[in-house]
Amino acid sequence: MEQNRPKQTDQQATNAALAALAAAGNAFALGQLWEVNKGFVRRQLWQWYEKNQTVADSAGLSFEDLVQEGYFAVDYAAKHYSAEQGSFTTYLSYALLKQIRTATCGEHTRGVIT
């Protein structure tokens, strides 16, 4: 019996396919996944940066540094994403917060970053 899930959009299907290829080690697919989602990553990071600029400044991070960290979040999300978990961008949002926490507070932290 099929679950009542909303139908995937073309963008979600593209993200899922590119993430699967990137997880299998396809560097070109990872680059394409980054290009397709770069605008989303920048918007998410800018929202965080506007609210938490003092945190970023104290860690010595500019907005462009955070965008570079965003690439690592895309890589992490691609390697750990499963289509059963929902949309790739939702998973990527959590990966971005994880990467921000790592970049601003270090590898092992229990701090709350909003």
List where the protein language model places each region.
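Alpha-helical promoter-recognition and RNA polymerase-docking modules of transcription initiation factors
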Residues: 1-110
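Short, intrinsically disordered, charge-balanced linker/junction segments flanking boundaries
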Residues: 112-114
